[in-house]
Amino acid sequence: MGFITKAIPLALAAASVINGAEILETRAGVQTLADKYIVVMNDGISDKDFDSHRSWVNRNHRRRLIRRGAKAMGGMKHTYNFPTGLKGYSGHFDEQMINEISKRADVKYIERDARVQINAIEQQDNVPSWGLARVGSKEPGGTTYYYDSTAGEGSTAYVIDTGTDIQHEEFEGRATWGANFVDDMDMDCNGHGTHVSGTIGGKTFGVAKKSNVVAVKVLDCSGSGSNSGVIMGMEWATKDAQQKGADKAVANMSLGGAFSQASNDAAAAIAKGGVFLAVAAGNDNVDAADSSPASEPSICTIAASTEQDSKADFSNFGQVVDVYAPGDSITSAKPGGGSQVLSGTSMATPHVAGLGAYLIGLGKGGGPGLCDTIKQMAIDVIQNPGASTTSKLINNGSGM
């Protein structure tokens, strides 16, 4: 997820309150998207009042375009309505329109939309992996993955990423497309999402080899996207999981960016909706407290370990990290067949999402409480984990 070192000055950057809504500060290192915003409504706003607010925004935006000769803007684009209560929208507005919105008493805060990206940092083709064996063993250096034959059967993993090659032989027909918030191509043109999905539910590379995988595409071929688009994917996954049984669902987000209150609130809404969510800590070797959605306390934040049970040199750290998982030189599926090796907290996170699915298959309780279960099962082995950071490494409880 790394910060992109480009600070963009903006008249609205400083946090302020104008007759109601707070315009959140844009932190240094955030790659904001020009004239694009995320607006979050007050807690508890009714559907009727939310509809009324959106109608007001659309009317005023049209008037600005037609009557005032305002610079052409796209207006409202995405609407968010999580089943757990979080409501908001994103869009393309000029500064005057945003100032009008900020004066509304029904708006909680406004945030600049910003760029997010995947957390893989390197690749190497066709070398053996070690992560699975480590998850199933109390000692390092093993070559066998010990696991219960239930293998996550009956669970569903939502992979919020670049998409998944659902035809890959690793998934044996258990992978499906859920939603696409990027383009009209239901394919993984990057490879990151397929790799992540394989670590969760692949027949060879997966922690939960019988789990179902649902692709939720929020990142493009370069592995990049926006907070507003990612939040759309988070909302869709929450609603779909609740329809099918949230207690049987896990979600994986091997992505992120600089701190975003909207991104954190959306992650919290997933957890509140009863879905276990694993999120990458990030790859900048800094405290993950300044990263989102990794800094949201109600989810499970994952740092990356090496084959030698040490912190990977790229991995973020800090009190927000819940547990370590293998993330250095991990082999998994690639689009079109075969495998590739990637490193990053992106690769660590699906080991934990997969472990959550595996535990659901064993009959353990689902939901955000799975993070506590995983931490209780973890082993205290990570060397030099980083300041104020746990030294716990995940374990499935099956090995020697």
UniProtKB/Swiss-Prot annotation:
Gene Ontology molecular-function annotations: serine-type endopeptidase activity
InterPro entries linked: PCSK9_ProteinaseK-like, Peptidase_S8/S53_dom, Peptidase_S8/S53_dom_sf, Peptidase_S8_His-AS, Peptidase_S8_Ser-AS, Peptidase_S8_subtilisin-like, Peptidase_S8_subtilisin-rel, S8pro/Inhibitor_I9
Glycan-modified residues: 252, 396
CDD domains xref list: Peptidases_S8_PCSK9_ProteinaseK_like
Catalytic residues, chain numbering: 161 (charge relay system), 192 (charge relay system), 346 (charge relay system)
Localization in the cell: Secreted
Domain of life: Eukaryota
Keyword Metal-binding carried by entry: no
Any single GO CC term annotated in Swiss-Prot or TrEMBL for this entry: extracellular region
Record-annotated Inhibitor I9 domain positions: 36-118
Described function: Secreted subtilisin-like serine protease with keratinolytic activity that contributes to pathogenicity.
Official protein name in the record: Subtilisin-like protease 7
Species name: Trichophyton violaceum
Lineage: Eukaryota, Fungi, Dikarya, Ascomycota, Pezizomycotina
